[in-house]
Design a protein with these regions (language model features):
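A short acidic, Gly/Pro-enriched loop at the edge of an enzyme's catalytic core
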Residues: 238-247, 590-600
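Conserved SAM/SAH-binding beta-strand->alpha-helix loop
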Residues: 207, 561-562
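A short glycine-rich, Lys/Arg-flanked "PGG" loop and its adjoining helix->strand segment in the class I
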Residues: 193, 264-278, 616-631
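Conserved class I S-adenosyl-L-methionine
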Residues: 174-183, 528-537
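Class I SAM-dependent transferase core
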Residues: 12, 16, 21-46, 52-58, ...
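Conserved beta-strand signature within the Rossmann-like core of class I S-adenosyl-L-methionine
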Residues: 279-286, 632-639
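A short SAM/SAH-binding and catalytic strip from SAM-dependent methyltransferases
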Residues: 245-263, 598-616
Length: 689
């Protein structure tokens, strides 16, 4: 047993950071996982579907054979190559393949209506046709097809060694298995064959399209020992009386770790513990990072040490682990008592590469509450309805009450969300003319008000109504800790999210929760300096920096989201601001000229770099920062901390500062200052060594 594996068993709550690579990755914000070879082969397959020319299939297969080992190990390419070979196979061979139920269902889904879904998948996946940002249904369809083609791939054995790892699971006839996050049931139906008529498999899934496929496949093939279960964030969905011998979680726990709130994850893992018999097994299959240019990238991943350290605190003891390919591992845990006398060790920024995991909380989270929208809570909804009614009825008493309700609530939940912004609009509504003029004396605040408050608060009213889904009444017994989402279809989701970002980040009351003035003083920005605001959003800090550096200074405002940049461009043009230069960038390049900046500033962004950037993308991005910094220049990172369960958390993403400090140390940055003005927010200042 090597040293790393030994540590998983002997010191499960300690993590050694030994390289620049992130410990967890949940997927790219950009399309760097789409390769030229994949696009070429996809177009050849698409063209074959149109004209039936088999030469195109041979060309596609030749392309896939060249790129699969290097570009897309474990991805969709092996499935698409399988389809090409199927189309070329003799009729007898085709019939033999389709005699296998899962392969037949795979082909049936993709071939229906003259391969309509396969055509849609190739066109959207490889950006041959672009999907509208507000077309939620098409995006959901694409997500289903991505999962379906990836997971029910008839050639999955080729990259995963499925038979070998299933032997490691040691599933026995008669056992009861919960397949959590079953997707379209690849493992569920394999487990069903093993456990036999005396056993039972629960295929547990949240995606409605996967659920429909599972039910149809079970009905069509008269499968008696698989039961479909609808899961929610509150738990895996099994009824209180169901007990299972094994819970199986494949290609999911990286999301449980990084995308669930602590509350959601406690419910989720708690329901797994409840369902397992004493001594029952939790089997996790997930992706590992391969730090080698000779082996291809394989999508989301989570380090075994990060995963094991968390599950230790939930009462799961690692009893076996197996690396059946460099990119894929199996971890097998036994349900034991939850540690009751654990004594944690303090972490130190002086030794950031040695991390003590003292609780079950994640060291980083990425899910902004509400995955389709900005989301809302039950308590927030009550405040929002009071404010909406007050503005619609022009009732100062209700507006005042809404203000007071938000003022009481915002320190308790969703720090940094829009509650203090709602308070600002209530304050403006209730103010006299002199106070209103004072509140709009700042250019940025005037534009902010005009956008949401113009035409008798038209957009503000709409935002309140949609944000809190006021047309829909929540159940009276809804849990106040649960996050809800707007589910209506009469307002574009993309527009709502765009409004939400502008509403939150350019909030004139932002200083209430962030202590912005104190933060800006600590940054020591001088007149005449050049500063880059990376991921500037609506330009809140860009505008502040513009005032601080003066006419002789320059602020480079960079953003990958063109829609966010338009608010800043409008401010520049309307008020003739000369010292701001806007740059539309990509995740791998901040587009700064060499030695152009005294300071590079990133607010609420590095967590995304850490958890969503493919490693080579992160390498290139940080190299572009180093290129742009002048000798002696500083990299300043403001981000959201992960808090303990007794401290209200920032409403969206968060990251343990030690993860940033340790990672940047491998890129040659030395921490020179750390400040923590509030529990939910920290400032890190780095210089190149």
């Amino acid at each position: 047993m090597d040293e790393q594996n030994r540590a998983l068993y002997e010191t499960p709550t300690e993590i050694e950071v030994t390289a620049k690579d992130s410990l967890v990755h949940v997927g790219s914000l950009d399309s760097f996982d789409i390769t030229k070879g994949g696009i070429k082969a996809g177009k050849l397959l698409l063209k074959y579907l149109d004209n039936g020319n088999e030469k195109l299939l041979h060309q596609a297969i030749k392309t896939y054979e060249k790129i699969i080992p290097d570009e897309n190990f474990g991805g969709e390419y092996t499935a698409l190559e399988w389809l090409c070979k199927y189309f070329l196979a003799p009729e007898e061979a085709k019939q033999d393949l389709l005699s296998k139920p899962l392969i037949k269902s795979f082909y049936d889904v993709l071939s229906k209506d003259d391969f309509a879904d396969l055509r849609t998948y190739i066109q959207l996946k490889y950006h041959i046709v672009e999907v509208d940002k507000n077309d939620v249904e098409t995006k959901r369809k694409l997500r289903f097809l991505e999962d379906f083609i990836l997971f029910n791939n008839p050639d999955r054995e080729r990259w995963e060694k499925t038979r070998e790892n299933m032997e490691k699971f040691n599933i026995q006839p008669g056992e009861r298995i919960a397949d959590v996050g079953s997707g379209p049931g690849y493992f569920s139906f394999k487990f069903a064959d093993i456990v036999g008529d005396e056993g039972k498999v629960y295929a547990i899934e949240t995606n409605p399209m996967h659920l429909d496929f599972l039910r149809d496949h079970i009905k069509e093939n008269d499968i008696k020992n698989v039961e479909v279960v609808v899961s929610q964030f509150e738990g895996i969905g099994l009824t209180e009386d169901v007990r299972v011998d094994t819970v199986f979680v494949c290609s999911l726990y990286h999301n449980v770790y990084a995308a669930f709130t602590d509350f959601e994850r406690e419910k989720f893992v708690g329901s797994i513990r409840h369902a397992l018999v004493e001594g029952g097994k939790l089997i996790i299959v997930d992706n590992d990072l391969v730090d080698s240019s000779e082996l291809p990238y394989h999508g989301p991943y989570i380090s075994k040490s990060l995963l094991t350290s968390q599950l230790y605190h939930y009462g799961f003891k690692l009893i076996d682990n197996y690396q059946f390919t460099p990119q894929r591992y199996v971890l097998i845990y036994e349900k034991v008592d939850v540690p009751s006398d654990f004594k944690g060790k303090e972490n130190s920024i002086d030794d950031p590469c040695h991390i003590h995991v003292n609780t079950a909380g994640s060291l980083i989270r990425y899910r902004i509450i509400g995955t389709s929208t900005a989301g809302y809570s039950i308590r927030g909804k009550a405040c929002g309805k009071m404010m909406y009614d007050g503005f619609m009825e022009n009732d100062p008493e209700k507006v005042q009450k809404a203000h007071d309700m938000f003022a009481e609530l915002w320190p308790k939940e969703r720090i940094g969300d829009d509650y203090t912004a709602f308070m600002w609009f209530c304050e403006y509504y209730l103010a006299d003319d002199n106070k209103k003029a004072e509140m709009l004396s700042d250019y940025r605040d005037k534009m902010y008000f005009d956008f949401f408050g113009g035409n008798d608060y038209e957009k503000l009213k709409k935002y309140l109504y949609i944000k809190f889904y006021l047309e829909h009444e929540e159940a009276e017994d809804a849990d106040i800790e649960t996050c809800f989402e707007y589910e209506g279809k009469d307002f574009p989701i993309g527009t709502l999210n765009e409004w939400n970002e502008y509403f939150v980040f350019n909030n004139p009351n932002r200083f209430l929760w962030e202590k912005t003035d104190t933060m800006l003083d600590l940054l020591d920005i001088k007149e005449g300096e050049s500063i880059a605001d990376l991921g500037c959003g609506g330009g809140y800090f860009t505008y502040e920096f513009s005032k601080m550096v003066g006419d002789k200074g320059t602020v480079y405002a960079t953003e990958i989201n063109k829609d966010a940049m338009k608010y800043l461009d409008a401010l520049k043009d309307t008020y003739n601001v000369k010292n701001i230069k806007t740059l539309v960038t990509r995740m791998n390049d901040c587009k700064l000229k060499e030695n152009s900046c005294d300071k590079v500033f990133m607010c609420s962004m590095y967590h995304a770099v850490y958890i969503t950037d493919i490693e080579f993308v992160k390498d290139e991005f940080i190299a572009s920062i180093k290129k742009g910094l002048r000798p002696g220049g500083q990299l300043i990172i403001v981000d959201n901390d992960v808090t303990d369960r007794f401290t209200p958390s920032y409403y969206g993403p968060g990251i343990m500062p030690e993860l940033i400090i340790s990672q940047l140390s491998f890129y040659g940055f030395k921490l020179v200052k750390k400040e923590q003005l509030i529990p939910q927010r920290f400032i890190l200042v780095f210089e190149l060594q």
